[in-house]
Amino acid sequence: MTNLRKTHPLMKIINHSFIDLPAPSNISAWWNFGSLLGICLMIQILTGLFLAMHYTSDTLTAFSSVAHICRDVNYGWLIRNLHANGASMFFMCLFLHVGRGIYYGSYLYKETWNIGVILLLTVMATAFVGYVLPWGQMSFWGATVITNLLSAIPYIGTTLAEWIWGGFSVDKATLTRFFAFHFILPFIIMALVIVHLLFLHETGSNNPSGINPDSDKIPFHPYYTIKDALGLMFLLLVLLTLALFSPDSLGDPDNFSPANPLNTPPHIKSEWYFLFAYAILRSIPNKLGGVLALLASILILLIIPFLHTANQRSMMFRPISQTLFWILTANLMTLTWIGGQPVEQPFIIIGQLASMLYFMLILVLMPLAPLFENYMLKPKW
């Protein structure tokens, strides 16, 4: 069996990726989230496949088909709850994974990082079109508000929005194509994940110290397979607790009402994992400006590798950068809170200040702090 594992063309790839892979001996639990994301993707694809067997992408029957899944299909309620809350777990792991990359300087593996940002955007697109499918009030109005942002693009905006809609508003054609996108995108994500891992295995993993770990590597199996299994147990515990005890706690009550184009909900908001970007979008009174800020809030990740000014890779030994990182984390939590609040004072001004601080931290303060840290590291005698 050992020989087959090392010689068989397919087994050899698996062996080099998950068994005999040399891994740094000191990587912490923050390195668990990559494998957890892979498991989240598998859970989402499997539960989504079973949901697609019973779902109908038609404006007249979409809402009823979701109710039918929850009431009449064997364990349909469980599959649906796992899928809906699995998305929340997916984004939780994604944010922690990206945060780890920023904290420990993993972004210096530029190819891996760039593919990761593309993956983040693709997952966000998948989650957005997926949220529209139950065809509840928030599904419909969320789709209307976000797709309507395309009309802010000069000259071609209105045409582009109508092209996406397949008509003059969000309707049957929109729902059908969103279902098609929601079905195909996870498989595109799987392909991108393989490319992401391919680039990662070219360089090997980073580690908390940020120092080249080549002199001290251990095999991935059994050390990190067992560590990832522990992470998986925690993930499943949280996911099952959510899905079985409070499956609707992260959703919006408005989505229990069927979509009604004649009745606008008092407060349109997205799922919690988009609220930080939604708050940035709303903080700018101009429509095009808001759209550009929304895009910039995610695409800013692409320029982080070029803003690295520190002599050290990781923030592990850089207290000022650490402080700024945790301020950024608190700021993102503030933006998430603001995104869920109505558009009125004092939430408007808090959102504007938090949005400004978000861009200032990443573009100005976090590149400047390491220059001072570099100076402090120089021997003064």
Curated annotation (Swiss-Prot):
It is a multi-pass membrane protein. The chain crosses the membrane at residues 33-53, 77-98, 113-133, 178-198, 226-246, 288-308, 320-340, 347-367. This is Cytochrome b. One of its GO terms (biological process) is mitochondrial electron transport, ubiquinol to cytochrome c. One of its GO terms (cellular component) is mitochondrial inner membrane. GO terms for molecular function: metal ion binding; ubiquinol-cytochrome-c reductase activity. It comes from the Eukaryota. The cytochrome bc1 complex contains 11 subunits: 3 respiratory subunits (MT-CYB, CYC1 and UQCRFS1), 2 core proteins (UQCRC1 and UQCRC2) and 6 low-molecular weight proteins (UQCRH/QCR6, UQCRB/QCR7, UQCRQ/QCR8, UQCR10/QCR9, UQCR11/QCR10 and a cleavage product of UQCRFS1). This cytochrome bc1 complex then forms a dimer. Component of the ubiquinol-cytochrome c reductase complex (complex III or cytochrome b-c1 complex) that is part of the mitochondrial respiratory chain. The b-c1 complex mediates electron transfer from ubiquinol to cytochrome c. Contributes to the generation of a proton gradient across the mitochondrial membrane that is then used for ATP synthesis. Heme 1 (or BL or b562) is low-potential and absorbs at about 562 nm, and heme 2 (or BH or b566) is high-potential and absorbs at about 566 nm. Binds 2 heme b groups non-covalently. Heme b b562 binds at H83, H182. Keywords: Electron transport, Heme, Iron, Membrane, Metal-binding, Mitochondrion, Mitochondrion inner membrane, Respiratory chain, Transmembrane, Transmembrane helix, Transport, Ubiquinone.
